[in-house]
């Protein structure tokens, strides 16, 4: 079945079921910060690829090519966000040999046609964007391992790519070797089902904080534990930072950022590349004060 037909089915089947996802998107805070020079430099370094999408859309892919490419990360930004906003982390991954390919979703405030789409469109168009991005990577980076990563609403997308099954049905990609999820979209009623994570066998690293809330919607940070707790045991890790909020991936202090960088890089090397030394570092990792680390 083509992506176009699949998305047409989504538009009908999910019109009411995805209302909680819309509520989350409307409630999710959108940080407003003056651009920092390193981020601006990172954004300017992207190659942009425009690809056709269903219903006459085009998808803008930001591609940050690693000089010595070892694998490719498909990254999905948070609601209303944009790929370059995560330059602090993504630039480090690129330096470690992970090319980053990141679509600009229609819910982004930087999308040129943002006003043409309501929040209801965010879910289905994101699914299509990421399928197109993966197809692009398979065609242009043939043979390179694929890793899915994302933040907030984008982390839900990465979990779906890794095998999580929402009300939309199974949409996972068996080529995904590992998932790195910063925060999550929480337990969205009507979208996240009791068995949503039952088939999430892909190695998954979940990163959150005990102040990771979305005002008026996610009132208990423990909801971000669900992908870790409700997926099959084996190759799952959870990092929880004391006092960290929903923007941890962007606003972490140097010590927390360094831990996230080391852990995500080792995780991608261990499971994306089959690197035994990286796996040994993960196994030996201990959490510093103010951070909890769980494995299952």
Where do the protein language model's features map onto the residues?
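Glycine-rich His-Gly loop
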Residues: 75-79, 152, 209
């Amino acid at each position: 079945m083509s992506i176009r037909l699949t998305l047409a089915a989504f538009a009908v089947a999910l019109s009411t079921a995805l209302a909680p996802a819309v509520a989350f998107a409307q409630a999710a805070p959108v940080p407003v910060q003056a651009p920092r020079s390193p981020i601006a430099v990172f954004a300017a370094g992207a190659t942009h690829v425009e690809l056709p999408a269903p219903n006459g859309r085009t998808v803008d892919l930001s591609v940050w090519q690693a000089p010595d490419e070892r694998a490719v990360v498909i990254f999905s930004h948070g609601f209303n966000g944009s790929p370059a906003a995560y330059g602090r982390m993504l630039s480090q991954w690129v330096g470690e040999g992970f090319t980053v390919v990141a679509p600009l979703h229609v819910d982004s405030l930087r999308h040129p046609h943002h006003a043409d789409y309501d929040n209801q469109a965010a879910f289905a168009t994101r699914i299509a964007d990421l399928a197109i991005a993966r197809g692009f990577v398979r065609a242009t980076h043939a043979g390179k391992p694929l890793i899915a990563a994302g933040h907030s609403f984008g982390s839900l997308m990465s979990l779906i790519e890794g095998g999580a099954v929402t009300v939309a049905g199974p949409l996972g990609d068996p080529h995904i070797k590992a998932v790195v999820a910063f925060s999550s979209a929480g337990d969205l009623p009507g979208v996240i089902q009791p068995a949503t994570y039952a088939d999430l066998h892909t190695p998954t690293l979940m990163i959150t904080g005990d102040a990771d809330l979305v005002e008026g919607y996610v009132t208990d940070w423990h909801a971000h534990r669900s992908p870790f707790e409700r997926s099959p045991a084996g190759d799952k890790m959870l990092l929880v930072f004391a006092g960290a909020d929903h923007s941890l991936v962007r606003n972490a202090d140097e010590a927390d950022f360094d831990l996230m960088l080391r852990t995500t890089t080792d995780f991608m090397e261990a499971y994306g590349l089959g690197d035994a030394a990286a796996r040994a570092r993960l196994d030996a990792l201990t959490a510093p004060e103010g951070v909890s680390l769980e494995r299952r």
